């Protein structure tokens, strides 16, 4: 889909001047020219609210947050990474509905000592992510505030262009389960960062180390980039909708967990083909052999790749860019009669994915 063009490094979090030093107005005057322009924009940043075209008469709307600690570490991510990832995760949610992303509203809360260059790098990340993954989408407004913890909150809008939305509820027995995009890379990248990108002598276990993380990224760019600045196949959302997708979501929390969400919403079970999962694992090992025998686990439970997982009628060819992973089966054919995601005929495990309330540890990540 394109290449990331990083405008900064993790050291961008330690440069001057600061937000507290120049204030909100001066900061915004530097940010606005760097933001991507939305083709649907009628009135953009600078007024009390934006005005955006809604030619379909409907809006697809989604919101996602990124908070320092559970969602990112400034020692690992560049400011550009943060803007890119915040944009991409929201664009993927819009795409998963079969819509075209049209506009973003961005709110950022940051400590007073945050360098202005950090905000400029974040803005550049939004610009580049939109340019690469969703041309024509841009930032139309937002808010800037003060907080002891750097936080990004993004609301994304999309246009269905007279199509029906693709929800999680439409999967039917016999449908083909398929995916567009990468699986397992982001999870493997996070594993590498916690393995190699931390300070071995820190008082707090798992304390991120900027230099070690940069070295890890340099040694394993395909995996660490996928974690810190993922590329989602945004255009494939419309392709899937026009190709007859019956259900769809983006894989943000892990293949098994997100497949289970389709199963529960559609009241079916999803059977992942072990042969196809091994194919995905082998592809991951080809990208970087460091994953070794962990590859299948990363494919099934890694999360944050923002691939698009969809179901399609069995009598139609899969759209370009999608590859099969399994099938949809009736609950009467599931081993325990419950909506679930199975690997063959076996449930993967009790969770098999990321839950921010259950899984985050302030030390271990």
Regions found by a protein language model. Give the residues of each.
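Acidic, Ser/Thr/Pro-rich beta/coil linker or hinge segments at domain junctions
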Residues: 23, 230-231, 278, 318-365
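Short hydrophobic/aromatic beta-strand micro-patches
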Residues: 157, 309-313
């Amino acid at each position: 889909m394109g290449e990331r063009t990083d405008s900064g490094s993790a050291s961008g979090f330690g440069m001057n001047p600061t937000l507290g030093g120049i204030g909100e107005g001066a900061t915004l005057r530097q940010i606005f020219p760097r933001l991507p322009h939305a083709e649907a924009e009628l009135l953009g940043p600078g007024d009390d609210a934006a005005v955006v075209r809604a030619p379909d008469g409907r809006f697809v709307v989604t919101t996602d947050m990124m908070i320092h600690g559970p969602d990112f570490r400034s020692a690992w991510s560049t400011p550009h990474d943060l803007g890119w990832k915040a944009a991409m995760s929201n664009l993927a949610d819009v795409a998963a509905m079969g819509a075209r992303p049209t506009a973003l509203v961005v709110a950022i809360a940051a400590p007073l000592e945050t360098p202005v260059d950090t905000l400029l790098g974040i803005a550049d990340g939004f610009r580049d992510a939109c340019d690469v993954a969703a041309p024509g989408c841009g930032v139309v407004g937002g808010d800037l505030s003060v907080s002891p913890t750097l936080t990004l909150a993004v609301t994304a809008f999309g246009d269905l262009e007279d199509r029906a939305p693709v929800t999680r509820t439409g999967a039917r027995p016999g449908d083909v389960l398929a995916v567009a995009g990468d699986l397992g890379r982001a999870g493997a990248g996070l594993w590498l960062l916690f393995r190699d990108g931390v300070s071995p002598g820190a008082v707090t276990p798992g304390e991120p180390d900027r230099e070690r993380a940069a070295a890890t990224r340099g040694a394993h760019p395909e995996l660490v980039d996928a974690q810190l600045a993922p590329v989602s196949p945004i255009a494939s959302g419309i392709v899937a909708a026009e190709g007859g997708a019956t259900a769809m979501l983006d894989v943000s929390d892990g293949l098994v967990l997100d497949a289970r969400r389709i199963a529960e919403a559609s009241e079916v079970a999803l059977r992942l083909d072990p042969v196809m999962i091994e194919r995905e694992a082998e592809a991951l090992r080809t990208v970087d052999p460091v994953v070794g025998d962990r590859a299948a686990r990363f494919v099934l439970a890694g999360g944050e790749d923002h691939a698009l997982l969809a179901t399609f009628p069995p009598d139609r060819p899969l759209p370009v860019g999608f590859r099969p992973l399994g099938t949809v089966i009736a609950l009467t054919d599931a081993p325990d009669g419950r909506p679930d995601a199975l690997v063959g005929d076996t449930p993967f495990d009790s969770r098999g994915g990321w839950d921010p309330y259950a899984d985050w540890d302030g030390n271990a990540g």
